[in-house]
Amino acid sequence: MTKQTIKQTPFFLDAHSVLDATLRDAGYLNDWSFSREEIFAVVGGVAESGVEVVEVGYISDKPDRILAGCCEPDFLGELREHTKGKINLAVMISLTEKNPQTLFASRQGVLDLVRIPCTIEEVDDALRVAAAASEYGIATSLNLVNISTLLPQQFAATAQKVQQSGVVDVFYLADSRGACRPEDISKIVGIVRENWQGLFGFHAHDNTGFATVNALMALEAGCEIIDGTVNGLGLGSGNTKLQYAMQLVQQKEPNKPYRYEPLDRLSRFDVAMPAEKSYFYYLVGAKNLAQLWVEPLVERYGEKTAYYLQQIPRRPYTKIEQVFAEVEADV
């Protein structure tokens, strides 16, 4: 089956756009255990704000997942009816899903965009998933993660491969570790922009306090789409706050009809994170470590975790065993 044309919605027509990732990224903090009321409130409020895309969560057929953790077809249909078509519905899919084609087939007509996160080693797998989604008229985003660990030539080669594949609608860069600095973003986005002609997005994390500045630098260097979350909620130190992302895009597109009043109603929405972990997430960003390594590091080193992290050099660690070796070489 040939690839269908992307549906003509505001998201795909506008020069610059915002994607809300609250339910998906903040779900790492509570294992996506949001209630129906919370999900409808977030999706409805974001839709009223005029933001172009809302990411509802993950699609999955795993039996232990509910609501935002699996995004069943009927549930997506209810959300589409709730928002009256004012916003595009997006989800993320893990490459660990065994039957992506079945997931896409059952959600045809109620899902606008699927985001496929992958490391540079997983790009070919992600392209196969994108091809499957395209068969059902679902737009695709390949989200390259851990960009703070990659070299310039790797960005160029990956962008060229994705461009040549013909199955990806949006190429995304994700600063998954919150380790990138503004000058890094300008260079990385510039390299990809030279090799990728399609829609281009950026997802920031705020571990070292650069999420908003990095989102701005991404827009200035050639990205069209940036992510934000309600109250900046997300894994680790969170993401660019949604209202900040909206303001950055409005600087590019002054006539954007964004409304900020609906966000006031969402200001109380929160997902708790243990306060004692907040400093660890700053350190993993500063040292260029994966955020999901915080738990195993604390389990291994206990109260000495912060001290050990302060001692190790900043490097593009790709495996947690490399961090263990670095720490224990000096113990």
Label the model's feature ranges.
Residues 2-331:
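Catalytic cores and adjacent flexible loops of soluble metabolic enzymes
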